[in-house]
Structure formats: structure tokens, C-alpha cells
């Protein structure tokens, strides 16, 4: 048995297990199985994903995220905020501006303390509507195309997202209708996250079905950015908007088409778990 220290964190209810690989390296070939084990909410610690804080490949701290099904994601908006808070709290990073390396690229981040809470702002890059970058079927941007009874717009904000505007997000049977779009591999070859969005003036209310979690999460950072990006593209919102989710709110802004996300990150508790890597 190997003792692995962990920190349980959440960003607006989207919860993660942080593993500091400076102290607790997890074998590369075991990461997927480890994530599935510890994320299980009955037989493990319980989380939407595992964040591995790794030694930098270049000049930045390196974040890797594995979903609860063991798949590795390119990026996670709520996850990177938790990652930055952990890094600041544990001396890997100073408050203020820095960079984090992810599979989606190197992202600029900024951590600040306000009323005793850690807020993290992340430069999420330019939302990509090119179907080759999502990926999605077709040669033209995937904008308001009819699919499974809805008008769907697709965009990549680090990971692929489908965005659907409805009158009332709470009236949507998310677990019934979202998987039809998420698993439409003819349209979205790598699968896609699915967001149902309700307009509230220039702000948005969002529910997200997450790929890899295979269910609804209380909040999705990249989904909030995707929803704001599509709303802006369609002329529904301006350069700044607040996105409300079941887990809390995120402030999304755009400067020269670059998306910025700001929101909280919180530590829940710390602990140790015994892991038999030979059995994984």
C-alpha cells in the first residue's frame, strides 16, 4: 500500500481531488485507474475529477485533469481555479499573475484574495468556432443547426461544447435529452459537452451535461465560457456577462475576442488514502 496525500476542493460545487506530484507521484500508466477509484462517491473519496499538479514541462506549472470515468480532459475551467488556489496556498505559485500549462495550451491566470476568499481569473483564450477545431461535422461554423429537436451551436473553449438556448433551463429533462447530443459521434466525433442556456437580460443561466462525468455537474467553467461566447456571437450579450449555475456564478468577459473567466475556488478538506497500485 502507498499512502497518497490529497486535497479535496471545489469551484462552484464542481469538485476535485488535487494530487501534488511534487510529493505524491502517481505512475503514468495508473493515473486513469487511480482517478476512477478515488472519484467514486461510494467506494472512493468522491469527485468529478482528479487534478494532478505536476512538474512543469516548460516554464509553467503543469495541470492534468482526469475525469471520474478515467478519461483525460484537455482543460477544466473550475478545475484550473482550484489548481491555482492549491498552488498559491502551498507555495508553488505566488498571488498575482502567473501561467499554467494544460493540454489545451499555456493559460495566464491571476489569483487574488477578496473578503477572505480566493478568486481566480483565467485567460481562456479565443473561443473556436471552426468545426475542425471542435471537432464537428461540416465545413462551416456550427451555428444554430437543427439537431435532435434543438438548435445547436458548437464551440471549443479548451474542450468542445454544444450550446442550446431555451426559455427555461429547469424545464429541460437534461439526463434524457443531453446524451443524445453528447453521443452523436457522426456530428461530434470526439463527443461533446452539452449546455442548456436561459437568457436573463444580459446575463445567462446554464445547466451542463459534462462529457467524462456523464451527468450534470453543479457548474462547468468551460461550459460557462462557451455559453457566454455563443451568446456574444449571436448578439444576445455584451463583452461582460454573469453566468449563473446551480453551484454559483462566474463572471465572463471578452477583450479582443479573448475570453476571461473569474470565480471562486475553495478547499474542503485534506487527507490521506491508501492505494494498492499493483491492483489498479
From Swiss-Prot:
Q: Does the keyword Methyltransferase apply?
A: no
Q: Return one Gene Ontology term, BP aspect.
A: lysine biosynthetic process via diaminopimelate
Q: Which UniProt keywords apply?
A: Amino-acid biosynthesis, Cytoplasm, Isomerase, Lysine biosynthesis
Gene3D superfamilies from the UniProt entry: Diaminopimelate Epimerase, Chain A, domain 1 (3.10.310.10)
One Pfam family here: DAP_epimerase
What are the GO MF terms of this UniProt record?
A: diaminopimelate epimerase activity
Q: What is this protein called?
A: Diaminopimelate epimerase
Under the subunit heading, UniProt states:
Homodimer.
Active site: which residues? 76, 220
| Protein's organism | Methanocella arvoryzae (strain DSM 22066 / NBRC 105507 / MRE50)
Report the domain of life of the source organism: Archaea
InterPro entries tied to this protein:
DAP_epimerase_AS, DAP_epimerase_DapF
Amino acid at each position: 500500500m502507498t499512502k497518497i496525500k490529497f486535497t479535496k476542493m471545489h469551484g462552484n460545487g464542481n469538485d476535485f481531488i488535487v494530487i501534488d506530484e511534487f510529493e505524491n507521484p502517481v505512475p503514468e500508466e495508473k493515473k486513469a485507474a487511480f482517478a476512477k477509484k478515488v472519484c467514486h462517491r461510494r467506494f472512493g473519496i468522491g469527485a468529478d475529477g482528479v487534478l494532478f499538479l505536476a512538474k512543469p514541462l516548460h516554464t509553467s506549472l503543469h495541470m492534468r485533469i482526469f475525469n471520474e470515468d478515467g478519461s483525460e480532459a484537455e482543460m477544466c475551467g473550475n478545475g484550473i481555479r482550484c489548481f491555482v488556489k492549491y498552488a498559491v496556498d502551498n507555495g508553488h505559485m505566488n498571488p498575482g499573475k502567473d501561467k499554467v500549462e494544460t493540454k489545451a495550451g499555456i493559460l495566464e491566470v491571476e489569483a487574488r484574495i477578496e473578503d477572505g476568499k480566493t478568486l481566480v481569473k483565467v485567460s481562456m483564450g479565443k473561443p473556436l468556432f471552426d468545426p475542425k477545431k471542435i471537432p464537428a461535422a461540416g465545413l462551416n461554423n456550427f451555428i444554430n443547426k437543427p439537431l435532435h429537436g434543438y438548435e445547436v451551436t458548437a464551440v471549443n473553449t479548451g474542450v468542445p461544447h454544444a450550446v442550446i438556448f431555451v426559455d427555461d433551463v429547469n424545464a429541460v429533462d437534461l439526463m434524457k435529452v443531453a446524451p443524445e447530443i453528447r453521443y452523436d459521434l457522426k456530428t461530434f466525433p470526439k463527443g461533446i459537452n452539452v449546455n442548456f442556456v436561459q437568457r436573463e437580460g444580459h446575463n445567462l443561466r446554464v445547466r451542463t451535461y459534462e462529457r467524462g462525468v456523464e451527468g450534470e455537474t453543479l457548474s462547468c467553467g468551460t461550459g460557462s465560457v462557451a455559453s457566454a461566447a455563443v451568446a456574444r456571437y449571436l448578439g444576445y450579450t455584451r463583452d461582460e456577462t454573469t453566468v449563473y449555475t446551480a453551484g454559483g456564478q462566474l463572471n465572463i468577459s471578452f477583450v479582443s475576442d479573448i475570453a476571461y473567466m473569474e470565480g471562486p475556488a475553495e478547499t474542503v478538506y485534506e487527507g490521506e488514502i491508501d492505494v494498492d497500485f499493483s491492483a489498479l
